[in-house]
Amino acid sequence: MKTLFCIGELLIDWISTDIDSSLVDSVNFIKKAGGAPGNAAISCNRLGGKSAFAGKVGNDAFGMFLKETLVKEDIDTENLIFSEHPTTFAYVSIKKDGERDFIFMRGADELLEFHEIKLPQENAVFHFGSATGFLGGDLSETYFKALDYALEKKFFISFDPNFREALWPNPEKFIEFSKDFISKSDLIKLSEEEALLISGKKDLQEAIATFKLKKNAIVCVTLGKNGTLLYFQEKLEIVPSISVEAIDTTGAGDAFIGAVLKQICDKTPENFDEVKNYVSFANKVAAIS
């Protein structure tokens, strides 16, 4: 089994407990561990995988809480670095349909430097799923250097852009950076919104056709309750999900990618049916997460 190596932000999600309330109107919040890369690592480990996380948190009570969370999930925290800057926060409210309202307050996550990371030498799958990895600062430089390292080592590379409109009022740079990562990744997981935004198209099939892809790259476009649009080996098919009531979609995409990557860590798929089975299982994991 390969180790899933996740790099990016680990943060505190302050989640509104006021039902169907915007952040403007929310009063009550609970604290939860958050950050897409960490969520993906947790998803992988809960399914029996082996994950490691690389990122930076504050040397404060919140950073300690985040480390304890990863340790409880048996995730390798050798590359969880503590900073004198405060831990990053995200404030989240949940609407009636399960969709989210976000505000980010960046902190230590953007200060991760490449030289601080002890990189795996073999048997690794690299996952780039950071929502803040393209925003500048040391993390952005580290993100791109880690991609180059993974390419040099010929590791399997996974990319999830995790677009947040609140972070990108002007998304041109996000689109440029995402296209670069898409062209160099073996697995690309996108939401429908992300696929259309990055491609500049209005149709998902056209969007996928515009991407510059590696040979045998897997593209998964998640469609919520409608399943996942899967592209692999020039074949395109919607893989259905199971029907559940949407209460909170926070982390569902991370649960999905973690489930796909756990299976890839066990065995790199060789044909469409094998990938389809991976995605079908991941759809179910995401639906009940």
Label the predicted regions.
Residues 44, 191, 253:
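Short, conserved phosphate/pyrophosphate- and ester-handling motifs at nucleotide-, phospho-/glycolipid
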Residues 42, 89-93, 227-231:
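Short beta-strand scaffold segments in enzyme catalytic cores
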Residues 1-75:
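Glycine-rich phosphate/adenosyl-contacting loop at the front of the ribokinase-like
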Residues 51, 77, 157-158, 219:
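Hydrophobic beta-strand scaffold residues
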Residues 10, 161, 255:
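Active-site metal-binding loops of divalent metal-dependent hydrolases
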Residues 131-209, 227:
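Conserved beta-alpha-beta core of the PfkB/ribokinase-like small-molecule kinase fold
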